């Protein structure tokens, strides 16, 4: 079923609000992509408002990890250690912005939005 992101059709009292127009396609939302740790990257290109395109990362194997000096490396993601968005996400290996991931070179904090950007960027955490 579609996710509609328009105003509620009910008043606080429970009465109905009669809209002056129909629902618009641009007001539809989508289910979250829930980017998971996998053996290889998997991307999905979707059409957005205005005919633009958005790249969704549905499965991630690699992350671009940057250290304090700004030098970056493409490294393999091992697992999700912690996710402040939802503690169940760490158990399910779902990557979101702010998640702490374990990589080949150490722990890193995700700075990009994989479901919106189509890539996992992270900064290396000091041990």
Swiss-Prot record:
GO BP terms: translation
Keywords: Ribonucleoprotein, Ribosomal protein
Gene Ontology MF term list: structural constituent of ribosome
GO CC field: ribonucleoprotein complex; ribosome
TM regions (residue ranges): none
InterPro entries reported for this sequence: Ribosomal_eS8, Ribosomal_eS8_CS, Ribosomal_protein_eS8_arc, Ribosomal_Se8/biogenesis_NSA2
Similarity comment text for this entry: Belongs to the eukaryotic ribosomal protein eS8 family.
Assembly description: Part of the 30S ribosomal subunit.
Alphabetized HAMAP family for the sequence: Ribosomal_eS8
Name listed for the protein in its UniProt record: Small ribosomal subunit protein eS8
UniProt source species: Pyrococcus abyssi (strain GE5 / Orsay)
